[in-house]
Structures are given as C-alpha cells and as structure tokens.
Curated annotation (Swiss-Prot):
Protein encoded by which gene: tpm
Protein name in UniProt: Thiopurine S-methyltransferase
Record family assignment: Belongs to the class I-like SAM-binding methyltransferase superfamily. TPMT family.
Lineage: Bacteria, Pseudomonadati, Pseudomonadota, Gammaproteobacteria, Alteromonadales
Main location: cytoplasm
EC id: 2.1.1.67
Class of the enzyme per the UniProt entry, highest EC level: transferase
C-alpha cells in the first residue's frame, strides 16, 4: 500500500476511518493503563483524531505521527489550536501546547523521538495495514516504544473476504501471534459494533467485532 493511497483518500475526503466522536473503548479503558496525567502519549497514524483532544484533556502531552499533511493541518484548524511548524529531517514537526505531531513516514521516525513517552494509543494504525505490511509496522512500533511502556490497542475483526480493507481485519489470534514477541498482551474488551457501521452492513458483512487490548512493552 503506497503513500499515495492515503494522500488520495485525504484529498478526496474519503475518510470513513475518521470518527466524529471519541472512541468508546478509549473512554472506558484508558484509565486501566494507569499512566500519569502529565505523561506523554504517542499516537501512531493519528490523522485528525478527536481521541488526541480527549487525551490532552486528561492532562497528557500528545505526540502524534501522521503521513498526510492535510490531515495534520485539518486537526489544528478544526480544533482552533495555534501551531508552529518546522522541517526536521524527513519530517515536519507541528508544535502546540499539548499536541505535537510529526508529519511524515512512521517508518523513518527515529526512536529517540519517542524515548520519553509514558504510553501509546493505536486505534487506526494496526488495522490500516494489509497483511503484507502489518508485521513491518509492528516491528517499527516496537522500536518506538520504550521498555515497560503501556498502551491501548483497538482492533476490528470481521471475515476479511467479505470486504476489501482498510480497515483490515485483525483477529485476536493475529495479535497474540505477532505482538507477543514484543508486548505482554491483555484483552480488555470485545464488542459487536456491526450496527454502528453501515458500510459493513451494506456489504453484507455478517459480524464486526471491536476489541481493546492493554499492551506492555517487554
């Protein structure tokens, strides 16, 4: 999946993956991570997610990474945040009081940038990758997460043959098989969200589960 795929989605505003409200599993389970309020939280492939605003409201300093420039600009504009921007290496660094975003390729993001984070939150990153790229993303995520750091992972699972992703189906078995090398994994919740997703209903997807996992870097 080439970067132009995502750039085209944002250019055409075909962003069904963007949620107009804070994720319900984030609201319910974030406190279980026991991350100090002032701790920095990393959000990979953050888009213009309102989840970042929620994390900031909890007192966290949010550090996002997003490929598409328009997504970053829309986030700050729509939330009326004053921001500065400077090019640093292969990325552009957007800075405001509580939400900083590195715009560029997450695969070239240096681990030193995230070395002081206290937590991380992945709702739309792991499920954005097809199988051919997902394992590479997991390896890069592991490089970016310091030992002992805890995070909340949110996934979707459904019969992949019924719908062309993204979002791609990520099963509990896949999570255990490919993430357990790097993380201790605890399943926090699994809920049926088919009724809330008309696109899946229209394609006759028989079931759609959203799961939340607590991850701890080994």
């Amino acid at each position: 999946m080439e970067p132009n795929f995502w750039h085209d989605k944002w250019h055409q505003q075909l962003i069904g993956f963007h949620q107009a409200s804070v994720n319900a599993l984030l609201l319910t389970h974030w406190q279980q991570l026991e991350i100090k309020p002032q701790g920095q939280v990393f959000v990979p492939l953050c888009g213009k997610s309102l989840d970042m605003c929620y994390l900031a409201e909890l007192g966290h300093n949010v550090l996002g990474c997003e490929l598409n420039l328009s997504a970053v600009e829309q986030f700050y504009a729509e939330n009326q945040l004053t921001v500065t921007c400077e090019p640093i290496g292969e990325h552009q660094f957007f800075d405001c009081e509580q939400v900083q975003i590195w715009q560029g390729d997450i695969f070239t993001l240096a681990p030193k940038i995230t070395q002081d984070i206290s937590g991380f939150y992945d709702r739309a990153a792991l499920i954005a990758w097809p199988e051919s790229l997902r394992q590479a993303y997991v390896k890069q995520l592991a490089k970016l997460i310091p030992q002992g750091c805890r995070g909340l992972l949110v996934t979707l699972d459904y019969p992949q043959e019924t719908l062309q992703g993204p979002p791609f189906a990520v099963s509990p078995t896949w999570v255990e098989t490919h993430l357990s090398e790097y993380f201790d994994i605890t399943l926090l919740a699994c809920r049926d969200v088919l009724d809330d997703n008309p696109r899946f209903i229209k394609k006759d997807v028989p079931w759609l589960n959203e799961s939340a996992y607590l991850l701890k870097r080994k």
